[in-house]
Amino acid sequence: MQRALKAWFVPVLLGVTPVWADTVACHIIYGGENFSVSAQPTAEPYKVKGEKIGRYFEFKAVYATSPADLAAISIYVYGTSSGESVLIHQAKFASGIGNDAAPWGFTGFQYVYEPSKSSELQYWCEKTP
């Protein structure tokens, strides 16, 4: 019993997320292609990098776990047609949210439009063990 408690407390004290923590998996459709972006729990949300999706989008999923009062899952979609990343969609969910909007995870099925090129990106995200 004492060994099991040490195995749980040591990662928490070091600020490391246990390997059994949930992750966020986002499924993206753009231009007839499927993309996947995953987000691991992190205590440093500003260090998470976005992923380029096609020519005109960048997608970033952030699963912030600490501090506990600010823990959340944030989804950002940027338009990149001008050469710079411009935020065009943002969604935020409580970190304890479940996949209640099944079959489309906790976000439901979302549509995002890039205004200058009339491009459409679709996505949905789910928590996975």
Task: Locate each region found by the language model.
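N-terminal signal peptide c-region/cleavage motif recognized by signal peptidases
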Residues: 16-21
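Cysteine-centric segments in proteins
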Residues: 22-129
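Bacterial N-terminal signal peptides that target proteins for export
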Residues: 1-9
